[in-house]
Amino acid sequence: MPIVELADPICPVCEFPSNVELHFGGLVCGACAAFFRRTVSLNIRYLCEKNNQCKGMRKNCRACRFDYCVKIAGMKRNLVKQRRNSTNTPMYILNRRKDSGNEEVVRGMLKRMYLQFSSFSGFVTTTQSKWAHHSRKSSMSPNKEAEKDVSKILKISHGSLLKYYIYQITHDKRNNMNTLNIKSVEEFLEITSVQNKLAAELCKTCPGVDLLDNEDILILRKYFQFSNVWIESTWNYLRENNSVPIDDSELDLKLLKFINQVKSTLLVSFSQLKFNTIEFAAFKSICIWKLVYHETSRAMKIIAQEHYESVMKALNDYYQTYTSMDSMQIATRIGEITLLIISVFQMYHDMAKLYIQLGLPF
């Protein structure tokens, strides 16, 4: 009798294959259970721009996701244990309550990922103009200049933050296996396992993460892992000048197709732009903080913007101090680096679909 391989059940809320269990009176996946618990315990009410009539995956709209938790999955608010004190309550929640004088926190609509893709080109153009202007500024007094060189939110100087990312790619080499050279799914799983643990460690030391709640930190870990497994592997693959044929006959065809996609897009871009270590460290940090594939809180968006601006200011200072580039050349170079994020967005989206198809944790 042939063995029937049972697929994971589909979560009725997010519609992803997952380990569905009973949580708060409804059968849902662990991620949706955590979302429901956090929403209820913090007394958050989300708003939907389509009056809770969004189609497709509910993960793209937190209001519709919560609505499905209650109406479709049958989850019950009264089964969630209320927080006894505000010790672990995110600061933005406490500030919102203080400003409004209301215990309920109303949060606005979350834009879908494809809207962010379509508006990103405009963002790049604005960034180029902004950094050209920044490069020309030289009239500020030394004290004010030093004051502006420190992020008040992250509590670290722009240069030190960039060094944090440089250290990651130059010193942390506990796993020399490269994803683009794997010969089997087993090797790939070994790499992702190591990088998942490393991502957890990096999240503990990353400036500003202490201001985020646990749900945001779990999302951030995925971005760190993605950047290590795919982006850094691509850069190392180029630097090592890999031209030796790899026996990939045992590799899953879907995984092989994605690896070839990475080589034909990101690898080609890297070979054209010729990043040095400092530029790549800056690019990697942007990839981590500009990826907004799943829903993120306002606090996380603030921290992400702070990382982006601080790293880019440090990169701009590096160009001004250690290269002969003028302000327009600096603006153009930073624009090229930023523009490359668009292909990384698509790459992350395709990777997410691949992991689901392969039944890998994501």
From Swiss-Prot:
Predominant localisation class: nucleus
One MF term in the entry's GO annotations: sequence-specific DNA binding
A single Gene Ontology CC term: nucleus
A Pfam family the protein falls into: zf-C4
Zinc finger residue ranges, NR C4-type: 11-32, 48-69
SMART domains for this protein: HOLI, ZnF_C4
Subcellular location: Nucleus
Domain NR LBD: 145-362
DNA-binding interval(s): 8-82
Keyword entries, A-Z: DNA-binding, Metal-binding, Nucleus, Receptor, Transcription, Transcription regulation, Zinc, Zinc-finger
Functional description taken from the UniProt entry: Orphan nuclear receptor.
Family per record: Belongs to the nuclear hormone receptor family.
Protein name: Nuclear hormone receptor family member nhr-77
Protein's organism: Caenorhabditis elegans
Designated gene of the protein: nhr-77
